[in-house]
Amino acid sequence: MRYLSLFSFFVSFLTYAQIDHWESVVLPGDQWQYLLPSSQPNSNWNQVEFNSSSWDSGNSGFGYGDADDTTVLPSTISVYIRSTFTITDASVIEAMVLDLDYDDGFVAYLNGQEIARNLVSGSVPNFDQASDGNHEAML
C-alpha cells in the first residue's frame, strides 16, 4: 500500500509489526516536497494523487531562525510539506505513531484525512493563518 504523509517540520512515523520492535517509515533527513504559499493551495494538496512536482524539495527538518534546521526557509507564516512512503504488508501493523517537532502549530494528514493538530483552529486553515499560540520545537 502506498501512503502519503503531510505535515509541518520534522516528522517521523513509527510502525511495528510485532510488539518487540518499531520500524520507522519516514526517517530524519528524508527528502520532502514543500510549498511556501502566497495564496491558498489547491484543495486536494493533501491527497495521494496530487501532483506536487512543482513544489520545492528539501530534507527534513524544516525551519528558520536557529542552527538545527536542515532545510532553511525564509520567515513565513506557514509551510506545506509532503512525503510519501510505502508499506508492503499493512496487515502486520498494529499501530502507527506520529512523532514530530514543530514551531508553533501544525495540522497533519495521512492520505487526505486529518490525523492530528495542535494550536491551529478552523476546519481547513488558511495559508496566512497564524497559530493560536506558541510552541517551541525541542530539538
Language model region names:
Residues 1-20:
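Bacterial Sec-dependent N-terminal signal peptides
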Residues 15-39:
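Boundary/junction segments of secreted and surface-exposed precursor proteins
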Residues 25-27, 48, 76-80, 91, ...:
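Short, surface-exposed loop/turn motifs at beta-strand boundaries within globular domains
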Residues 32, 55, 85, 91-112:
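Aromatic-lined ligand-binding clefts that engage carbohydrates, nucleic acids, or primary amines
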Residues 37, 60, 117-118:
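Residue-level detector of high-confidence beta-strand sites
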Residues 48-84:
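Surface-exposed, low-complexity/disordered Ser/Thr/Gly/Pro/Asn-rich loops and linkers
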Residues 111-139:
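Beta-strand-rich ligand-recognition modules
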